[in-house]
From Swiss-Prot:
It is an enzyme of class 4 (lyase). CDD domains: eu_ALAD_PBGS_cysteine_rich. Its EC number is 4.2.1.24. This is Delta-aminolevulinic acid dehydratase.
Amino acid sequence: MHTADFLDIEPTEISSILSGGYNHPLLREWQSERQLKKNMLIFPLFISDIPDEATPIDSLPNIKRFGINKLVDYVKPLVEKGLRSVILFGVPLKEGTKDPVGTAADDPEGPVIQAIKLLRKEFPELYIICDVCLCEYTSHGHCGVLYDDGTINRERSVSRIAAVAVNYAKAGAHCVAPSDMIDGRIKDIKKGLISAGLAHKTFVLSYAAKFSGNLYGPFRDAACSSPSNGDRKCYQLPQAGRGLARRALARDKNEGADGIIVKPSTFYLDIMRDASEICEDLPICAYHVSGEYAMLHAAAEKGIVDLKSIAFESHEGFLRAGARLIISYFTPEFLDWLSN
C-alpha cells in the first residue's frame, strides 16, 4: 500500500509566514489598501430629449434611458440608499437635432442642462458630473468638429468642447468630464472656466487615458453615438499604447485637470497604476464601461460566475491598482450590497 511522503526540510523562515495576517475576516479588511464605499461610486445616467421616455437598453442589463419627466422618480430611491454622484450623458432622439458642430450639446432646453437644473433642485447634496463630448450631438457621430476630408479639426473642436463645458458649469454642474480625447482641450476648458469666473467651483475630470477598443458597444446603443463613418482610432488611444497613455496623463495633469479617468478599466490596470504614479496628487477614476458590465452579466447568466462576487472582485481590483473613484453601472446594486 502506498503511503504519502513528507520531505525532511528546514524549518520555515519567519518572513515566509503570511497567513497569520489574514486568517480572520477583520484582518482581511485591514489588509485591503482601499475598501469599496458608496461615496466612491458614480452612476451614469442617460437623459433623452423625449420627456416621458423610460426605455430599457437591451445590451445594458437593468439600465434605462430616461426623459426629464421620469428622472426624479428613478434617482430618488438611489439617493435615499446613499447615491452621492451621477454622470450625465445627453441623448438627442428628436429628428433634426444633430448637426456637424453638435449645437444641441449645450442647448438650454436640451436634456443635459435641464437635468442639471432639475437634479440640483431636487437633490441638493447630489454631486453632478457632466460628460463633455460632441459625439451624441453631431450628425457624423464623431467627437469633434471635422474638416471637409473627415479628419478632426483640433482648433474648432476644442473651442466648441470648451464652450459646452463652460455652459454646463454655468447651468450648475459641479464637475465637467471631457471624454473626446482631442489634444489640448483641458487647457482650453480650464481657461474658459477661469474667464467665466467658475474655475474655483468646477472640477475638471479628464478622460486622460481613454482607449479605442471593443467594449463600448452597449454605451453607443444607449447614447446613439456610433460614428456614421470611420472610427475613433485617430484620437482615442491605441490599445497597446502605454507610452502614449503616460504622455496623455502627464499632459492633462499639466494642463490643469483636477482628476483623471482611465477607460476602460479591467484590461488597463497597468495604466491605472501608471496614472496613480504620474498623477499621484490627483484622484484617479476607473470607468467600468458598458462592455465590461455586460460581459459580467453574460457570464453570470451562464452560471460561470456569481454576479455579486465578480462585481466586487473587479471593482476592488480598480482600487488596488490606484483608483479612488469608479464610474459603474453596478452602482444601484452596490448601494444595496454595501448596505447589507
